[in-house]
Amino acid sequence: MTLTVDGRQLTVEKGKTVLQAAIEAGIKIPYYCYHPGLGIDGSCRVCLVKIEKMPKLQTACSTPAGEGMVVMTGTPDVVEARASVFEFLLINHPLDCPVCDKGGECPLQDFSYSFGPNESRMEFPRRVFDGEGVKADVDFGPTLMLNRNRCILCTRCVRFMSEVDGDAQINITDRGNGSQIATFQEEGVHSLLSGNLMDVCPVGAITTRDYRFKSRPWDNPDAVDSICTFCERGCNTTAWLKAKPEWARGARLARITPRYNPDVNDYWMCDIGRFDYHWIEGDDRLLRALVRSGDTAGGELQPVDWHDALAKTADRIEANGGRGALRFLISAHASIEELFLLGRLGGAFGLPEDGVAVSWRVREKPQPAHTKFKVPPVDAPNVRGAGDLGFPTRTTSSGEPDTAAFRRSVESGQVKALFVFDPGPAGSIGDVSWVIEARKSGKLALLIVQGPLMTDLTRAADIVLPGACSYEKDAAYVNYQGRLQAAAKALTAPGDAQEDWQVFVNLGLALGATLDYTSSAHVRADVARELGGNETYKGLSDLAFARPLPAKHWLQASNPSERWKWDVMFQDLPPVKFEGRVDPSSIPVQAIRLQKID
């Protein structure tokens, strides 16, 4: 259908509202209660427009677009009514923008400057929730904080919990001037999706403990579009990088937020992917390769350089049956590139079909029965990809990986040398206590672990090779839908840690199996050639990885549904094409090149 907005003819799908039509066309109408991922409420009243042949002003968010409709967004009566609504919204709003976590990315700030009155006429005491009865700044559950004085009662949080989460834990209580959002007996919000409440809140009423007083948007100089690898959904995300003083090296991860993808995660993500990222820069990160002194489990792990680590790896594998006797236990956190290289190594070593096992963690994640955003129980991003590449991904009736036969061969002493690749967070590979016990008992003579963290497994290892996490490398994964997605590099691996494809290239070189690759893009090109008949992988060699975008441009271009709001803030910037992609082959990454070890 066709309608006219401010003299422009717009063609939109039937069923869309006037506000949706205006947003798609880049016509500026303010809104607070409307969110593209939630139902219509029409409570904030700031989206008032004038529609020809209608006697009163209408809310654009709740008025369906009609054939031949003529809409005006800037007539004097619209401007006056809109400014009056803003004045009412700001009457009791505290002037604490300098200490509010929403500052710098707050629609209330932006719209007030653009559409609100220039000054307040309020001469009476403001309504303040403070101390007696109802408190203003309170804990709002394990992950959130609530400041009731900032709330404008848009009901986005109420609708999110009811419509998306499936458990209506938040409601508006009291009435009139005393209206407030609250939970039953002030218990706060307990949900796997609670962090999304900060995203939907258009003011600083709901904030997260994780980001509280931590940073400002302008302190995060770059943002990288990537994906979350903490479960098999593969939510599309943005990693915000915080600048450090000059004496600190590079940027650091400030927060993870969801990125809109209607086919994967819509506008949302779970709290696991949002908040459980601190291990990436935590104290347990492996910074150097480690080799245990002596040939027994009783020796101490000593730091060594990469050349010594790989030389000793080759020596100890040779002393325990040679490379043909080596077996692999691989986490389903391994990327397509890493699995492909492991397959190449296994082929070069002559490993039998039962010489490799893939493992992952499965855990219950309680959610309401009617939730619209189900968090999968599998804590791994690439189970589907591992199966596509020919690795064993059989499961038991409970969905656990079926590694029983492989486990028996290790526990019985048939396996003398085991290589464990675990690039995910602690515990994500599943139960490996049997590996630790086999090494301690001496039934397993050699344990080599490659990963980013010091865990109980790495403490039991004879050789530890430090790798990178998913935010420290360009890598491809296939989620449970069979969708190929790219995780882009946001950080550089710390210390001597290397991207895992580099480690495999040099491990192969040390063991006499040449893998002639100079970048992860080079590996992807080979995977695409070998799996060209599989529809999923046809675009693998052209898969694009986002490079860090300047923060202003990211704010301007990140959320297609609300992109124009940032144009109001950054009118002096040139237009940004939201491609944010480059050909990864144009950014060569050099592997550590070692001389062949005799």
Regions found by a protein language model. Give the residues of each.
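N-terminal leader/propeptide and maturation segments of large enzyme subunits in energy/redox metabolism
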Residues: 95-134, 493-555
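Catalytic alpha/large subunits of respiratory electron-transfer oxidoreductases
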Residues: 90, 94, 147, 154, ...
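Short aromatic-centered micro-motifs
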Residues: 3, 49-51, 328
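Fe-S ferredoxin-like electron-transfer domains
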Residues: 45-229, 233-237, 242
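Short beta-alpha connecting loops at secondary-structure transitions
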Residues: 3-4, 67-74, 181-185, 223, ...
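Short, structural beta-strand-to-alpha-helix junction motif
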Residues: 16-20, 335, 499
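N-terminal cofactor/phosphate-binding cores enriched in small/glycine residues
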Residues: 7-67, 76-81
